[in-house]
């Protein structure tokens, strides 16, 4: 079971979505996430989210503290939101709903 989930919402600059996906694919190839799931999903209207499902808080922090972070690779292809931020992110520990059965 996952221990931590992270979601990073973003909007590629016009005409830059394919370049962003290529940069992400090259990053994932060259800097493997090991067995931690990371995928980009299409939210609609030109907005996407990078979802990371981590086994533990420690594995999440290891990704966050990488010297070469995926967000820095993606930033050049991303249109900032109205608040000036390139990404809108949230994360938290998994609530195991089976504990309530």
Where are these regions (language model features)?
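Glycine-rich beta-strand-turn "strand-cap" elements at beta-sheet edges
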Residues: 1-2, 11, 36-49, 73-101
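Short, surface-exposed ligand-recognition loops at beta-strand->loop->(often short) alpha-helix junctions
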Residues: 9-22
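Short coil/turn motifs at secondary-structure junctions
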Residues: 13-15, 43, 55-57
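An amphipathic, aromatic/His-enriched active-site/gating alpha helix that lines ligand/cofactor pockets
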Residues: 26-37, 53-89
């Amino acid at each position: 079971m996952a221990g931590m989930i992270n979601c990073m919402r973003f909007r590629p600059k016009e005409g830059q979505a394919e370049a962003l996906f290529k940069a992400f694919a090259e990053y994932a190839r060259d800097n493997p996430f090991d067995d931690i799931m990371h995928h980009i999903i299409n939210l609609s209207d030109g907005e996407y989210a990078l979802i990371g499902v981590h086994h533990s808080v420690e594995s999440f922090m290891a990704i966050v503290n990488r010297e070469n972070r995926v967000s820095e690779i993606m930033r050049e292809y991303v249109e900032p939101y109205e608040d000036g931020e390139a990404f809108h992110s949230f994360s938290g520990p998994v609530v195991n709903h089976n504990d309530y059965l």
